[in-house]
Amino acid sequence: MKPVLLMIVNDPAFFMSHRLPVAVGAQQAGFQVHIATRPGEAVKKIVSQGFLHHELPLSRSGKNPFSELYLLTYVWRLLWRLRPDVLHLVTIKPVIYGGIAARLAPVKGVVAAVSGLGFVFMAKGLKACAFRACVAWLYRRALGKKKLRVIFQNPDDRDALIGLGAITFEKSVLIRGSGVDLTQYQPAPESPETPVVTLAARLLRDKGVLEFVEAANILRQRSVPAHFQLVGDLDPGNPTSIEPSELERWRSEGTIECLGYRQDIASVFARSHIVVLPSYREGLPKVLVEAGVRL
């Protein structure tokens, strides 16, 4: 009987872009690979790879306690049904709920990947502090299993969770980023045309989108030749998402070009002179690694 790997990731598209090679490697090593995500167009691609998919009742930023309890119960039941040899948890909610459920289920080992601590650790005010304390308490419960390791992409996030008492240093592993397929991203000659400055990210305030637009306005006022382009989609499920009206205003002002979501990001970077990500909190951004290879 094949050993079982269960990967729980919030978004199917994120799995395809950041964790697919891990699942393929496990499959080639003889594991039966299960992927649990919320619904999305990329689920078809997951199934086409030969993985078994499970649909999670997951709202990435939902705060309804009944919905959250239902999600926790669903994950717990899934763990009892599959009894995975390895449970790989990726991003905040899967790490928290999967980690808690794993302490109450027959799971042999857990690998949690913290790619960033998110807006919860940046927000200010009394409400934000209370919510942050709640999340810290959940992390301590989620990461308490003995046979568990936590992958961090930078030492700051690792030190933050150690400082909260969520894990010990011995349980932490530092791996800087998700890596890049070098066959898809190769160096390209720089164009002599007007410099193109690109920000590729989900259109969130904590990704630095407002700062990017402000920088474009400043250079425009100073008559500095530069073409600013924004690549990415709005993220209505995230409380820091840019509003559609803001995006439309930027389009009408002509300060920046809004390209929307693009699958051909390698070709976008090939036409760029500068790639920026003025984000407030990240693990180690894959987009900058991709740009570093391409530019």
Where are these regions (language model features)?
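Conserved donor-binding/catalytic core segment of Leloir-type glycosyltransferases
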Residues: 189-207, 212-217, 228-229
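Glycosyltransferase donor-sugar binding loop
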Residues: 37-41, 200, 227-242, 258
